[in-house]
Amino acid sequence: MDERLLSGESAYEDSDLEYSLRPQTLRQYIGQDKAKHNLEVFIEAAKMREETLDHVLLYGPPGLGKTTLANIIANEMGVNVRTTSGPAIERPGDLAAVLTALQPGDVLFIDEIHRLHRSIEEVLYPAMEDFCLDIVIGKGPSARSVRLDLPPFTLVGATTRAGALSAPLRDRFGVLSRLEYYTVDQLSAIVERTAEVFEVEIDSLAALEIARRARGTPRIANRLLRRVRDFAQVRGNGTVTMEITQMALELLQVDKLGLDHIDHKLLLGIIEKFRGGPVGLETVSATIGEESHTIEDVYEPYLLQIGFLQRTPRGRIVTPLAYEHFGMEIPKV
């Protein structure tokens, strides 16, 4: 898979930046109003009862702020957060080590929770329900099970694939929040806030232009701002203007709707070779040289969101909106 400026997945260079930009409270957090308002109520109620917050599952496309919300939950509850990920927990013993290190009330954040192995999920069930850990000591006929009490804690799981979670695990979360793509106005506010942190002057129209091309995703908006800032410093006077922004994004091959060369390759491949479809996923994969799961999980969601692509039982179909975007005529049936 090509490295993508417009990928919602976190890249190495994003991590330090995201930490410095991360809001600390729900009041500072821009967007996701429905999830935010519900969490405000649940957190306040838990604090009034002097209880831990119910376990929380945050799901939705990458780059929308799941990690940020997990940290905010811990801050609002006044507790520490311990962070790990599904792929990092390889054995039940790894999970046991994490759980036994928690202090009362702590938040345990597991990113990519859908990638937990089923055997590890089974260790997690009693921990989530009864705050206890069942471990097996010894092997064979002499093996015995020992139950350890755990301090009350809140598990916050994050996933881009809620459907990949097993039903028993999903059912143990008391709070389920789907994170939605951001509006242009919300992203524009995020871009202006990030520019303040960078100590970079930015025109409001330039912030809007970056927001329009950021695919509804704050991580992409901040990444685009970083690249446009480079052009402003080298090709301009340091101020991010509309002119500099349009020039930079054109050179970066990010079009007015936030589509890049990979999106163009996928859509034009279906249009030019298969008359717009329907065409099967495996055929599209072979045509553009990308793995089918990458197309399905990474490239297609935004194209579906903006109505440029349809998934049908017969295959993928490019819509009239995409033809219009490319200035092409729709083929007659």
UniProtKB/Swiss-Prot annotation:
For region Large ATPase domain (RuvB-L), the annotated ranges are: 1-182
Tell me which Pfam families the record gives: AAA_lid_4, RuvB_C, RuvB_N
Catalytic activity line of the entry = ATP + H2O = ADP + phosphate + H(+)
Q: What is its main location?
A: cytoplasm
Q: Name one GO cellular component term.
A: cytoplasm
According to the UniProt entry, what is the EC number of this protein? Answer: 3.6.4.-
This protein's UniProt keywords: ATP-binding, Cytoplasm, DNA damage, DNA recombination, DNA repair, DNA-binding, Hydrolase, Nucleotide-binding
Report the top EC class in one word.
hydrolase
Please tell me where Mg(2+) binds in this chain.
67
Q: Name one GO molecular function term.
A: four-way junction helicase activity
What are the binding positions for ATP in this chain? 21-22, 63, 66-68, 129-131, 172, 182, 219
SUPFAM superfamilies under this entry?
P-loop containing nucleoside triphosphate hydrolases, Winged helix' DNA-binding domain
Where found, per UniProt?
Cytoplasm
- Region: Small ATPAse domain (RuvB-S), residue numbers: 183-253
Biological process terms in GO annotation? DNA recombination; DNA repair
Q: Which domain of life is it from?
A: Bacteria
Assembly, in brief, is: Homohexamer. Forms an RuvA(8)-RuvB(12)-Holliday junction (HJ) complex. HJ DNA is sandwiched between 2 RuvA tetramers; dsDNA enters through RuvA and exits via RuvB. An RuvB hexamer assembles on each DNA strand where it exits the tetramer. Each RuvB hexamer is contacted by two RuvA subunits (via domain III) on 2 adjacent RuvB subunits; this complex drives branch migration. In the full resolvosome a probable DNA-RuvA(4)-RuvB(12)-RuvC(2) complex forms which resolves the HJ.
Please give the record's comment on domains.
Answer: Has 3 domains, the large (RuvB-L) and small ATPase (RuvB-S) domains and the C-terminal head (RuvB-H) domain. The head domain binds DNA, while the ATPase domains jointly bind ATP, ADP or are empty depending on the state of the subunit in the translocation cycle. During a single DNA translocation step the structure of each domain remains the same, but their relative positions change.
**Function comment:** The RuvA-RuvB-RuvC complex processes Holliday junction (HJ) DNA during genetic recombination and DNA repair, while the RuvA-RuvB complex plays an important role in the rescue of blocked DNA replication forks via replication fork reversal (RFR). RuvA specifically binds to HJ cruciform DNA, conferring on it an open structure. The RuvB hexamer acts as an ATP-dependent pump, pulling dsDNA into and through the RuvAB complex. RuvB forms 2 homohexamers on either side of HJ DNA bound by 1 or 2 RuvA tetramers; 4 subunits per hexamer contact DNA at a time.
Q: What is this protein called?
A: Holliday junction branch migration complex subunit RuvB
What is the primary gene name for this protein? ruvB
